[in-house]
A protein has these predicted regions:
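Beta-loop-alpha module in the N-terminal Rossmann-like domain of NAD(P)-dependent dehydrogenases
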Residues: 52-115
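Aromatic/hydrophobic pocket-lining residues that form π-stacking "cages" and hydrophobic walls in ligand
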Residues: 23, 45, 85, 112, ...
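Short alpha-helical
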Residues: 18, 43-44, 80-83, 104, ...
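A broad helix-preferring feature
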Residues: 15-24, 65-73, 119-121
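Structural detector of well-ordered beta-strand residues that form the stable sheet scaffold
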Residues: 35, 58, 97, 122-124
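N-terminal Rossmann-like dinucleotide-binding module
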Residues: 1-52
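Structured helix-beta-strand junction loops
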Residues: 30, 92, 118-119
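A contiguous active-site-proximal alpha/beta segment in oxidoreductase catalytic domains
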Residues: 103-147
């Protein structure tokens, strides 16, 4: 990670939809500095960067990953690209925060974890529903064989 113990981590966001805005705000509230944004459309990314106060727009994920000053990449893109993007981010030796769902199948999820472990970076998936009572009940049902 590029951030020293005295500096906040630098973050880039992949995704310009509603959840991208949430990730920008959450990163800032956690003390990170949001330095860049990439989206599926350069025009939309520029408009969102201006609205969200993000200083740099990258043309694509590859350009973002070439930046040595980015410590963490938040993936807030469409679900079907989470796995390929998270693996690319980990391979670039940047930490990954991935919106749910982590992946569309268990093999892809395993590949994401393997890539992060091989690169020595953190991979986290946002899943705040795990604290909901209904999720605890479903988990208990699964463990008991009821599901």
């Amino acid at each position: 990670m590029n951030a020293s113990e005295d500096a906040s981590p630098t973050v880039a966001i992949v995704g310009t939809g509603q959840i991208g805005a949430v990730h920008v705000e959450c990163a800032r509230r956690a003390g990170a500095t949001v330095v860049g944004l990439v989206g599926s459309s350069p025009d939309r990314a520029r408009a969102k960067a201006t609205a969200w106060g993000v200083p740099v727009v990258y043309s694509d994920l590859e350009e973002l990953l070439e930046q040595p000053d980015i410590d963490v990449v938040h993936i807030a893109s469409p679900n079907h690209v989470h796995a390929s993007q998270a693996i690319a981010v980990a391979n670039a030796r940047k930490h990954v925060i991935c919106e749910k769902p982590m992946a569309l199948d268990s093999a892809s999820a395993g590949a994401m974890v393997d890539a992060a472990q091989a690169a020595g970076v953190v991979h986290a998936t946002c899943f705040n529903f795990r604290f909901y009572p209904l999720m605890h009940e479903a988990h208990a049902m699964m463990l008991s064989g009821e599901l």
